[in-house]
Amino acid sequence: MLSVIRVHLPSEIPIVGCELTPYVLVRRPDKNSTTDDVPESAPLEGYFLRYRWYRVQSDKKVTICSVHPTEQATLQCVFCSKRRSLVPKSYHCSPKCFTDAWQHHRTLHERAAAENNANEDDDLNRNNSAGSGSLAGSLSGSMSNLSIANNGPAPFYPSNITQKNGGETLVEVGGCKTYTPTADDISHVLKFECVVANAETKQIVGHPSTILTSRVIPAPSPSPRKLIPVNGADGMGHLDQDARIQSAGSFTVLSYNILSDTSASSDLYSYCPPWALSWPYRRQNLLREIVGYRADVVCLQEVQSDHFHEIFAPELDKHGYQALYKRKTNEVLSGSTSAIDGCATFFRRDRFSHVKKYDVEFNKAAQSLTDALIPQAQKRTALNRLVKDNIALIVVLEAKFGNQPTDPSGKRQLICVANTHVNVQQDLKDVKLWQVHTLLKGLEKIAASADIPMLVCGDFNTLPGSAPHTLLVMGKVDPMHPDLAVDPLNILRPHTKLTHQLPLVSAYSSFVRKGIMGLGLEQHRRRIDLNTNEPLFTNCTRDFIGTHDYIFYTADTLMVESLLELLDEDGLRKDTALPSPEWSSNHIALLAEFRCTPRTRRG
């Protein structure tokens, strides 16, 4: 007969909006064990599995700490408590919790004061009156405005909860195997029940197998990143559906390495809470972030093949995006093709139509290079060094929106978008440079045939000032560049061949163009390295901080209108590094708004 062996949840901490899928191991009538579902519609020898989810409701309300969601709140910031949008961020589990989080928490006060009226600005000054603007002084002032949360002691993992016993009641909230917590579940424990039932009588057979979760927590909500105009206009805009500052004829491009699930190991990112590192949570948080940017073109890296087909393509399709994908060429981990990641490019169907797609496999280029230039005795060594399974996805799109320059035939504007993920191994400087040069040569051919604006996006795994970065933005590499010393296969010689004719410029260098002023621009210039004109970082982990991600564009056909604001390192360090509960990748998203300009002939 059918029986349940055991059940458990991959994550003990349920989050609002994040689907819970229990692991259920059953023994079939033939004595074999399986995790396959046995629904009422397909019973086994007259029996099926019945599922129930319950909310454990208590007469006692429990409030959760906004910084440590597994802890009960004991303090509340008075300033935040009076502003509805900040209430979820107002709770803290201890004075130390509030003190440690103050550097980030203070920015919430400042942002609220700036975005609302002068009265709130006065409140901020009163709250911080004990200091002169220093961290210690400001914190002292706000500590005096903490209130004690009216919550008695309550165990984090309740035990022996039964229906209508001791002020607690079970409220059925779901009848499927999976359940997605709602806002009504916040601060409550959930109970999952799995039991074998008779298909004919519907009667329960045996005892149910149950799990109690910890208390449901709200999904962390990072402060929205703003779109900063860099074309001389004053002001800042939100990237929301009802108030986009994007003007007619312009378009936005997003580039984001989302950190594949196979790469998100607890060993590498032990500082990130397990629930925030789990794929079910990160998936939901990444989708919410990506959809929220409402970019016209989205370039993602490290998208696993199964996640593209099962999650990203169908979910973004609901928001009007068409999807294109190129996976890497080698299998990883268990050898499953689903574990291979790649590059995914999405575009809004109401803004663009698909014209052409090019797949770039650096492995094939490596094979051709080896066959042509490497002596037979060195071919195996050369292939071992060059074959790294990296790829690029190039798409040509036709604009559907107005106010775009057209060619003499009257056709709408074409735009070429390259999305790539270059080799990560830092010692293979020659391989990185060769991959970037190979991509640029391919883009040059497309540009020569169509003479269209070009965008080159992705994770290049190379720092500003490196040989690959220099080649991209300068069109050549100084023969004395130190990176060129690493060339055991002589694939970079002669160095004079390391050139290209595309007038590429990094979009984020627009933050430091002379003569451009605007609200908030000076603040964001401080997040740019003035030696390289690139962001101080796009990748921030415990052991590394630096810039690996870029959006390049051809400056003779495109101009930058706006840029997505960069993140502040101090704000990220409150969670040690990335990924974190608020930001679910070890990289940050980059986004730029462009406008096509009248073509000038490339010489």
UniProtKB/Swiss-Prot annotation:
Name the GO cellular-component terms. Answer: cytoplasm; nucleus
PANTHER family to which the protein is assigned, alphabetical: CARBON CATABOLITE REPRESSOR PROTEIN 4, CARBON CATABOLITE REPRESSOR PROTEIN 4 HOMOLOG 2
Subunit composition and interactions: Component of the CCR4-NOT complex, at least composed of CRR4 and CAF1 proteins.
Q: Where does Mg(2+) bind?
A: E302
State the Gene Ontology terms under molecular function: metal ion binding; poly(A)-specific ribonuclease activity; RNA binding
Source organism per UniProt: Arabidopsis thaliana
Could you tell me the EC number(s) of this protein?
3.1.13.4
Question: Which family would the database say this protein is a member of?
Answer: Belongs to the CCR4/nocturin family.
Q: Where is the composition biased (Low complexity)?
A: 126-136
Report the Pfam families cross-referenced here.
Exo_endo_phos (PF03372)
Specify where the region named Disordered lies, as residue ranges. Answer: 115-136
Q: Where in the cell is it found?
A: Nucleus; Cytoplasm
Q: Which cofactor does it need?
A: Mg(2+)
Q: Which InterPro entries match?
A: CCR4/nocturin_mRNA_transcr, Endo/exonu/phosph_ase_sf, Endo/exonuclease/phosphatase
Q: Which UniProt keywords apply?
A: Cytoplasm, Exonuclease, Hydrolase, Magnesium, Metal-binding, Nuclease, Nucleus, Repeat, RNA-binding, Transcription, Transcription regulation
At the top level, the lineage of the source is Eukaryota
What enzyme class is recorded for this protein? hydrolase
What is the protein name for this chain?
Answer: Carbon catabolite repressor protein 4 homolog 2
The free-text function statement in the UniProt record for this protein reads: Acts as a catalytic component of the CCR4-NOT core complex, which in the nucleus seems to be a general transcription factor, and in the cytoplasm the major mRNA deadenylase involved in mRNA turnover.
Catalytic activity, reaction form = Exonucleolytic cleavage of poly(A) to 5'-AMP
